[in-house]
């Protein structure tokens, strides 16, 4: 039985490479992914390596605030 409904939350992951390139206007946008995380198992910010279509390579995507 679940102890609470707010254990799993929806988070947005944003590419860290696109954020740095937007100053130089090299990329056309910012890549974002939507996923879930368990707040009890991972209380810190989530960072995953995902494919960025703007950079055209695998980059680190970090959790952002809503």
Swiss-Prot record:
Source organism of the structure = Lotus japonicus
What keywords does the record list, in alphabetical order? Chloroplast, Plastid, Ribonucleoprotein, Ribosomal protein
- Cellular location of this protein? Plastid, Chloroplast
Record's PROSITE patterns?
RIBOSOMAL_L33
PANTHER family noted in UniProt? 50S RIBOSOMAL PROTEIN L33, CHLOROPLASTIC (PTHR43168), LARGE RIBOSOMAL SUBUNIT PROTEIN BL33C (PTHR43168:SF2)
Family affiliation: Belongs to the bacterial ribosomal protein bL33 family.
Entry keyword annotation includes Ribosomal protein: yes
**Name of the protein:** Large ribosomal subunit protein bL33c
Disulphide linkage map: none
| An annotated GO cellular component | ribonucleoprotein complex
Coiled-coil ranges (or none): none
Source superkingdom: Eukaryota
Q: Which GO terms describe its biological process?
A: translation
Give GO MF terms, alphabetically.
structural constituent of ribosome
Main localization of the protein described in the UniProt heading? plastid
Which gene codes for it? Answer: rpl33
């Amino acid at each position: 039985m679940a102890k609470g409904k707010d254990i799993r939350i929806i988070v947005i992951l944003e590419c860290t490479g696109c954020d740095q390139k937007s100053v130089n206007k090299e990329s056309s946008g910012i890549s974002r992914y939507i996923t879930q995380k368990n707040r009890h198992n991972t209380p810190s910010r989530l960072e995953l390596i995902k494919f960025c279509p703007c950079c055209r390579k695998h980059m680190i995507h970090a959790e952002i605030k809503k």
